[in-house]
Amino acid sequence: MLSLSKNWNTLIKPNKVAYENFPETNNKAKIVVEPLERGFGLTLGNAMRRVLLSSLQGAAITSIKIPAIEHEFSSIPGVKEDVSEVILNIKGIEVKMHVAEKRIMKLKATGPCVVTAGMIETGHDVEILNPDHVICDLAKDKQLEMELTCKVGKGYVLSTNSYEDNLPIGEIAIDALFNPVKSVTYKVENTRVGQVTDYDKLIMFVETNGDVLPEMAVGLAARILQEQLQLFISFEEQEEDKQVKTDALLFSPYLLKRVDELELSVRSANCLKNDNIIYIGDLVKRTESDMLRTPNFGRKSLNEIKEILAKFNLRFGMDVPDWPPENIQELSKRYEDSYN
């Protein structure tokens, strides 16, 4: 009977996830995942994007209360904008909450001034992430007082669908965007492993409002997908599958790959062959200094091999317990599907 584990163990797996933040802000990041089986870049990229933009918990202002104002079709004395415009501006305020319970913030301002989000009295449990965001223009000698309620939630909740059905008279519900992720884009490019050049490389660009860092947002989205997909695994692994998994924990199966299967220059390949380096496991146990002492092996060859090892999440100078194993040829054959 075909081993069930071959359905997933024989697929190539990503050996690295690289995060690169943009210099101007920590709220934007480029995430690169490679290598992936052909088609998996689009599959994972689309799934991650949908979860990132819909399912993460965040905080938002859900209602406001202004003295003597009962609905959004009113005007506020001394305020240039009408209430509907003020509400639209308040929807753009980005908040971060350090507690799960709702909090009420207060705003007091005296004109003439431009009222901004930074003027809101938040307390210790709430943080305004864009304090320069403009709320309204207040005329000279006029005062503005307002209470703003913020809560934790997910997604986009319309004021008409608000879970606060019994708001007090004078408290106005507003549309709430809880999601801390502002934008997600992705693209898929080809990447190379050995002689195969059409594996997928997934490149994602994620921007948040600062409530969570992009790296954390991506991790949370992956965890949500993992939790949702777990239910579909309705079988038990066979004993040989469990044994293979246990054996694989000793060291990476990539160490069993022969170095002559790597796409090396003729000079580098000959140097390794002359130094009796047969498997990648033999190679990674050497230090860079050891390699540079090899006859005819220079810095160019060293950098070439380092780049290839990095694709497998390997490096020179690794400590590999019990290497080489006694049955190395048998193991290399058994795990051939895992690294090819």
From Swiss-Prot:
EC number: 2.7.7.6
Catalytic activity: RNA(n) + a ribonucleoside 5'-triphosphate = RNA(n+1) + diphosphate
Coiled coil: none
GO molecular function annotation: DNA binding; DNA-directed RNA polymerase activity; protein dimerization activity
Tagged with keyword Transferase: yes
Record region (Alpha C-terminal domain (alpha-CTD)): 251-340
Nucleotidyltransferase listed as a keyword: yes
Gene Ontology, cellular component aspect: cytoplasm; DNA-directed RNA polymerase complex
Complex and partners: Homodimer. The RNAP catalytic core consists of 2 alpha, 1 beta, 1 beta' and 1 omega subunit. When a sigma factor is associated with the core the holoenzyme is formed, which can initiate transcription.
Family, per entry: Belongs to the RNA polymerase alpha chain family.
Domain topic, free-text comment: The N-terminal domain is essential for RNAP assembly and basal transcription, whereas the C-terminal domain is involved in interaction with transcriptional regulators and with upstream promoter elements.
Name of the protein: DNA-directed RNA polymerase subunit alpha
Gene: rpoA
